[in-house]
Amino acid sequence: MLQLRFMPGWVPRNGFFGLKETIGTVHKRFYALASEQPSRKTVKPLDSRKTFLIDTYKHLMENSSMIFFVHYNNLSKTEDHHFRFKIKQTGGKLTKVRNNLFEVYLRNSHLPDPCGFVKRKEQNWKHPLLPLLKGPTATITYEDTNPQQVAKLLKVLQSAQDKLMVIGAKVENEVLNVEKINTFKTLPTKPEMQSQLVSVLQMLSGLGLVRTLENSSNALYLTLKSHNDNQKPKEDVESTTDAESKGSK
């Protein structure tokens, strides 16, 4: 039996909250929970805003290859729209976050359900991203790892001055500070690096082939010479040996 209940602004998918459904021109926001599925045991009510936000941060972190943390300082509505558009042009998405709830997610991110009940000693209080959540914070997320997108993003944020300031990032499984981010933006893309690696491997394999052919030629020469010597009559071999010894004198 499927029970439906309308909600104020979000909808769960696969047990976790996701984006609202759009049907025609009407945005219907609802919550559906099947009795056949095991219910989640969360600290806050399943239909609460806090549970929704923690689920949102879980989705951002698990589905983004690159996530940048920025100070979001006193942007006007016009500036907010402007920079969201510029960031979107680089392939990214700007999301304002609530630090206290993002901290909950980070401390519990190693658990199956970050919204669930957990003892204090089981939480990760040394998560490397926790120090970044100081003051008004936003994230800029990218689905793929691409240093060129980072270079474009930093160029966009330069015009924002201190209103949008990068303070750190997580690129795949590595946490980067500002210095490492500036180094990362100069790297080639993955396809370029793969192409360079293929070229190096081809070069090395070519050198190996030359050496193999040289060694094979030398081995073949020695084998043929030995076989030829064995086929000669003993007298010829002795005379040849005497001639070689005289020549050496």
Swiss-Prot record:
A single GO molecular function term of this UniProt record: structural constituent of ribosome
Region annotated Disordered, chain positions: 226-249
TM helices/strands, residue ranges: none
Tree of life domain: Eukaryota
The keyword Transmembrane helix belongs to this UniProt entry's keyword annotation: no
Keywords: Mitochondrion, Ribonucleoprotein, Ribosomal protein, Transit peptide
GO terms classed as biological process: mitochondrial translation; translation
FT transit peptide: 1-31
Any one annotated GO CC term: mitochondrion
Principal location: mitochondrion
Matching Pfam families: Ribosomal_L10
Protein location: Mitochondrion
InterPro entries per the UniProt record, alphabetical: Ribosomal_uL10 (IPR001790), Ribosomal_uL10-like_sf (IPR043141), Ribosomal_uL10_bac_type (IPR047865)
Cited PANTHER family: 39S RIBOSOMAL PROTEIN L10, MITOCHONDRIAL
Note, other: Present with 6000 molecules/cell in log phase SD medium.
Biological function: Component of the mitochondrial ribosome (mitoribosome), a dedicated translation machinery responsible for the synthesis of mitochondrial genome-encoded proteins, including at least some of the essential transmembrane subunits of the mitochondrial respiratory chain. The mitoribosomes are attached to the mitochondrial inner membrane and translation products are cotranslationally integrated into the membrane.
Family label: Belongs to the universal ribosomal protein uL10 family.
Subunit and partners: Component of the mitochondrial large ribosomal subunit (mt-LSU). Mature yeast 74S mitochondrial ribosomes consist of a small (37S) and a large (54S) subunit. The 37S small subunit contains a 15S ribosomal RNA (15S mt-rRNA) and 34 different proteins. The 54S large subunit contains a 21S rRNA (21S mt-rRNA) and 46 different proteins.
UniProt protein name: Large ribosomal subunit protein uL10m
Lineage summary: Eukaryota, Fungi, Dikarya, Ascomycota, Saccharomycotina
